[in-house]
């Protein structure tokens, strides 16, 4: 058990008790009510306790790609830099990159993430060791080639079986077709069928740039969401669509009808000059917006608090509307909405929810005065957290990783980068 004493919880000084991996009780809890020998007691004095953040779109091993290709557009970034480096990937490199990325996420308050990448056994190994929660998809790209399509689907299905057989509630599977401009109708059809067979979500890039939209229009005569909807890609599945920057009214209507979850990546979209997602329109149509960092190659960090702030600010400016996205809405994008998208029973601090939460020391200049903490968490916090609990276990204590030797990870990451870069 874990007992947090005297923390600011939901705006009040309270205690919180964890039994197993569940928040059992919130309120005034005496130490005499629990067994001292079986309970870890956390002093929450001067701390605010918040739900863990949920990163709904990333490529965690790309922590090793941080800073390799800045200040260029997406297609040049992909074809000229990222894809050539990814051709050198191996299990050791992906393992090192995932360790580095998950440490970065945990130390900035993220307790769960939704990933699309390669060498899933290495990702799973690192996730298991760090203690973070994850939904993982093998990234499928067939480039309209039948032989490659069969290989990609085989690997995706094997990955789902591998994750299923882990029987680990922290690690769940998904299907990750890259995007409509890199995936054939056949692989997308098969993706929907597999998602229904395995009862897993689909994670796909959609409408990130004008160039990719034009590619789909030239090939099919209609826009990406219209194209996928024409053959039932969104039917009877939970779909998380990353980016969604350039959307027509008809596409927004499809998204609304099909209950699409949007993984909004404001920082990556700005850095690659892709554009700004019409989030206000999405909200007006009751479309659920969540937040992702994307990979470190296009961000260049995995601090979801930066995405929360960017989401709260950018739409005010673009729409000349100070309440386009409020601080409360932006915070829920990164917590409650993300948890719902990944079907995780978290995102709020309530009895019966999973014990995925974060403690932040408020004795910092940028978090003072403490009376305005809800505002500070969105507009002034830098993301450095003190304690992180995931699935009822302490994984970060006083800013230090509990399960992992950080110095060793940094050495592994430097070695892996040299192998990638040469």
UniProtKB/Swiss-Prot annotation:
Substrate binds at residues 86, 178, 208, 294. InterPro entries: Amidohydro-rel (IPR006680), Deaminase_MtaD/DadD (IPR023512), Metal-dep_hydrolase_composite (IPR011059), Metal_Hydrolase (IPR032466), MTA/SAH_deaminase (IPR050287). Signal peptide: none annotated. One of its GO terms (molecular function) is metal ion binding. It is an enzyme of class 3 (hydrolase). It catalyses: 5'-deoxyadenosine + H2O + H(+) = 5'-deoxyinosine + NH4(+); S-adenosyl-L-homocysteine + H2O + H(+) = S-inosyl-L-homocysteine + NH4(+); S-methyl-5'-thioadenosine + H2O + H(+) = S-methyl-5'-thioinosine + NH4(+); adenosine + H2O + H(+) = inosine + NH4(+). Binds 1 zinc ion per subunit. One of its GO terms (biological process) is S-adenosylmethionine biosynthetic process. Pathway: Amino-acid biosynthesis; S-adenosyl-L-methionine biosynthesis. It holds the Pfam family Amidohydro_1. Its EC number is 3.5.4.41, 3.5.4.31, 3.5.4.4, 3.5.4.28. Its cofactor is Zn(2+). It comes from the Archaea. The keyword Metal-binding applies. Belongs to the metallo-dependent hydrolases superfamily. MTA/SAH deaminase family. PANTHER family: AMIDOHYDROLASE-RELATED DOMAIN-CONTAINING PROTEIN, AMINOHYDROLASE SSNA-RELATED. Catalyzes the deamination of three SAM-derived enzymatic products, namely 5'-deoxyadenosine, S-adenosyl-L-homocysteine, and 5'-methylthioadenosine, to produce the inosine analogs. Can also deaminate adenosine. The preferred substrate for this enzyme is 5'-deoxyadenosine, but all these substrates are efficiently deaminated. Likely functions in a S-adenosyl-L-methionine (SAM) recycling pathway from S-adenosyl-L-homocysteine (SAH) produced from SAM-dependent methylation reactions. Homotetramer. This is 5'-deoxyadenosine deaminase. It comes from Methanococcus maripaludis (strain C6 / ATCC BAA-1332).
């Amino acid at each position: 058990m874990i007992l947090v004493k005297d923390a600011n919880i939901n705006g009040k000084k309270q205690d919180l008790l964890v039994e197993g991996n569940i928040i059992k009780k919130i309120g005034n809890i005496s130490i005499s009510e629990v067994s001292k020998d079986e309970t870890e007691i956390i002093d929450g004095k001067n701390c605010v306790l918040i739900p863990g953040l949920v990163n709904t779109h990333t490529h965690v091993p790309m922590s090793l790609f941080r800073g390799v290709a800045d200040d260029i557009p997406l297609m040049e970034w992909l074809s000229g830099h990222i894809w050539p480096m990814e051709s050198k990937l191996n299990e050791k490199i992906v393992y090192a990159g995932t360790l580095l990325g998950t440490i970065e996420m945990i130390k900035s308050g993220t307790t769960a993430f939704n990933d699309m990448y390669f060498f899933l056994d290495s990702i799973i190994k690192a996730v298991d060791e760090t203690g973070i929660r994850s939904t993982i998809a093998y990234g499928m790209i067939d480039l309209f080639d039948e032989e490659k399509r069969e290989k990609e689907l085989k690997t995706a299905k094997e990955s789902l079986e591998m994750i299923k057989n882990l029987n680990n509630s922290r690690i769940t599977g998904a299907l990750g077709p890259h995007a409509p401009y890199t995936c054939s109708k056949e692989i997308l059809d098969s993706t929907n069928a597999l998602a229904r067979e395995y009862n897993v979500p689909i994670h796909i890039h959609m409408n990130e740039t004008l160039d990719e939209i034009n590619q789909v229009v030239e090939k099919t005569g209609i826009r990406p969401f219209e194209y996928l909807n024409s053959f039932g890609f969104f039917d009877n599945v939970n779909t998380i669509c990353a980016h969604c920057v350039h959307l027509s009214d008809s596409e927004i209507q499809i998204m609304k009808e099909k209950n699409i979850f949007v993984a909004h990546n404001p920082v990556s979209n700005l850095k690659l000059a892709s554009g700004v997602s019409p989030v206000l329109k999405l909200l007006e149509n009751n479309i659920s917006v969540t937040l992702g960092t994307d990979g470190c190659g296009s961000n260049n960090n995995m601090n979801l608090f930066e995405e929360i702030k960017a989401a709260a600010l950018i739409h005010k400016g673009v729409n000349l509307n100070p309440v386009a996205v409020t601080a409360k809405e932006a915070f829920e994008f990164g917590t409650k909405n993300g948890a719902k998208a990944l079907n995780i029973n978290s995102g709020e601090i309530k009895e019966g929810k999973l014990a995925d939460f974060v403690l932040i020391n408020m004795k910092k200049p940028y978090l003072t005065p403490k009376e305005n903490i809800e505002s500070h968490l969105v507009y002034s916090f830098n993301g450095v957290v003190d304690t992180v609990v995931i699935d009822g276990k302490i994984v970060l204590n006083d800013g230090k990783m509990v399960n992992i030797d950080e110095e060793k990870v940094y050495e592994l990451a430097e070695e892996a980068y040299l192998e990638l870069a040469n």
